[in-house]
Amino acid sequence: MNSQNIRIRLKAFDHRILDASTREIVSTAKRTGANVRGPIPLPTRIEKFTVNRGPHIDKKSREQFEMRTHKRLLDIVDPTPQTVDALMKLDLSAGVDVEIKL
């Protein structure tokens, strides 16, 4: 039989929501009889923004903000049709971006 993998990539700003969603996906996949590799933590993307504190003067006075994007990778090896159905019906948190590649 041809081995097929499902690769799931998750992104979120809050790592706690991301880890909870990852646990949900792993438990659903294992419950339906699939083999799961991961979660593999990928590098966190950090974007920094520097802005002036004052509206028109004091170039030396600045403030920095940062936005962190956390990422995880899951591989589901040899998924059953029940696994695919269960993953499609799974309701994850609103702050998690999910990319699925077959």
From Swiss-Prot:
Q: Name one Pfam family in it.
A: Ribosomal_S10
- The coiled-coil regions, if any, are none
Q: What keywords are annotated for this sequence in UniProt?
A: Ribonucleoprotein, Ribosomal protein
Protein name as annotated: Small ribosomal subunit protein uS10
Source domain of life: Bacteria
Which family would the database say this protein is a member of?
A: Belongs to the universal ribosomal protein uS10 family.
Instruction: Supply the source organism for this entry.
Output: Bartonella quintana (strain Toulouse) (Rochalimaea quintana)
Q: Which GO terms describe its cellular component?
A: ribonucleoprotein complex; ribosome
Q: How does it assemble?
A: Part of the 30S ribosomal subunit.
Q: Which Gene Ontology terms describe the biological processes this protein takes part in?
A: translation
The GO terms describing molecular function are: structural constituent of ribosome; tRNA binding
Does Ribosomal protein show up as a keyword for this record?
A: yes
Q: What does this protein do?
A: Involved in the binding of tRNA to the ribosomes.
Q: Which NCBIfam families does the record associate with it?
A: PRK00596.1, rpsJ_bact
